[in-house]
Regions:
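Extracellular glycan-recognition surfaces and repeat-rich motifs
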Residues: 1-32
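Secretory/extracellular carbohydrate-interaction modules
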Residues: 24-105
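Predominantly extracellular/luminal cell-surface or secreted proteins
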Residues: 62-64, 84-86, 143-149, 195-197
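Short tryptophan-centered beta-strand motifs in secreted/extracellular beta-sheet-rich domains
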Residues: 63-65, 126-135, 142-144
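Short beta-strand segments enriched in hydrophobic/aromatic residues
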Residues: 67-69, 100, 135-137, 148, ...
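Surface-exposed loop/edge segments in extracytoplasmic proteins
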Residues: 90-94, 114-119, 150-160
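Short, aromatic/His-centered strand-loop micro-motif at the edge of beta-sheets
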Residues: 107-130
Length: 198
């Protein structure tokens, strides 16, 4: 950053190309994932505060976005988006993950605190995917839909579901969206939508 002896080792996110998914209404530029100088390791968080209140702490909420990855730098599931209970970030209640599947495919996953779930299907690199993350406070579930049918009705089955337990309870209100820019990754994320209905 600007106040380190090695400026720009973990750069701020930059504006990327517009992502398009047929039937999805949200438009505009994306955020570049990656862009670190060669040899740089680590990650940088950017926090996008939504509220300092508790209005997003009961009922059901949906975060949707478009993503397109051309390279993944980590082995295993790596988070890149999170919903935080803190106005300034941290304390994520739910995350969206991505992982390599062999040499030419990727998988996605989600979490409810420490409970994780992964998709059984694999998806293509260099293709724009629609992700819809559902937080269901009443039923203690976080669901991830990957490339769902865009209709008025929520699909009957999610791509993966993380269910709460005695130690992992969805109870704190969401106050911010957290983006984790990782070294070794190349891609884009954007076209966000936050709402209380499908």
């Amino acid at each position: 950053g600007a106040f380190s002896s090695k400026p720009n080792t973990n750069p701020s996110p930059t504006i990327g190309k517009e992502l398009v998914y047929e039937g999805y209404a949200e438009k505009g530029p994306s955020i570049n994932i990656g862009g670190y100088p060669a040899g740089t390791k680590g990650a940088r968080f950017s926090i996008y505060s939504m509220t300092d209140g508790k209005q997003y702490g009961r009922g059901t909420f949906y975060l949707s976005c478009l993503v397109n990855f051309s390279k993944l730098g980590a082995n295993g599931m790596a988070d890149f988006l999170g919903l935080s209970a803190s106005y300034v970030g941290g304390s994520n209640r739910a995350n969206i993950y991505v992982a390599r599947e062999g040499s030419d495919r990727i998988r996605f996953g989600t979490s409810l605190l420490k409970v994780k779930a992964e998709t059984t299907m694999a998806y293509d690199y260099d293709k724009t995917h629609l992700l819809v993350l559902k937080l269901d406070y009443a039923n203690q579930k976080v669901s991830l839909f990957v490339d769902p049918e865009l209709s008025a009705e929520e699909p009957a089955e999610a791509s993966c579901i993380a269910e709460g337990d005695a130690e992992n309870v969805l109870k704190h209100a969401i106050r911010a969206l957290s983006f984790r820019n990782r070294s070794g990754f190349i891609g884009n994320v954007g076209n966000f939508r936050w709402c209380n209905s499908w």
